[in-house]
Amino acid sequence: MCDFTEDQTAEFKEAFQLFDRTGDGKILYSQCGDVMRALGQNPTNAEVLKVLGNPKSDEMNVKVLDFEHFLPMLQTVAKNKDQGTYEDYVEGLRVFDKEGNGTVMGAEIRHVLVTLGEKMTEEEVEMLVAGHEDSNGCINYEAFVRHILSG
């Protein structure tokens, strides 16, 4: 069922164990998406919930899973090719480039990230845009997307 190599699986298990706060070889359901993202995947919150079997929100910080159950979920997410590409993200941000100079206002990016789609918190957005704004409050969106996709 699993298409990962032995080396990949060992690397994934090592990362999984970093999220194991109690040392029992398990992580909380609420950590599953973070582990997947740490391993280079980019699932939406909805995708994570789907592979977890759509648990109730109050179960997310109670239910746990071990690596043997996590790995097939990671495989499912890795096979999903509906993830956006560099070009997709740049094209999406180009809509906000009113002057056609390759930059967008940082305030606009902040607004979009906290209000649309999978909403981020203001703290998450600040961490994401930190160091990308120029003296005019503009962000070069191509460099911004490259930075985000590079992990």
From Swiss-Prot:
Keywords: Acetylation, Motor protein, Muscle protein, Myosin, Phosphoprotein, Repeat. One of its GO terms (biological process) is muscle contraction. Residues 7-42, 84-119, 119-151 form the EF-hand domain. The modification N-acetylcysteine is found at residue 2. PROSITE patterns: EF_HAND_2 (PS50222). The keyword Transmembrane helix does not apply. The modification Phosphoserine is found at residue 57. The modification N6-acetyllysine is found at residue 81. GO terms for cellular component: brush border; cytosol; extracellular exosome; membrane; myosin complex; myosin II complex; unconventional myosin complex; vesicle. The keyword Acetylation applies. It comes from the Eukaryota. GO terms for molecular function: calcium ion binding; cytoskeletal motor activity; microfilament motor activity; structural constituent of muscle. Regulatory light chain of myosin. Does not bind calcium. Myosin is a hexamer of 2 heavy chains and 4 light chains. Interacts with SPATA6. PANTHER family: MYOSIN LIGHT CHAIN 1, 3, MYOSIN LIGHT POLYPEPTIDE 6. This is Myosin light polypeptide 6. It comes from Homo sapiens.
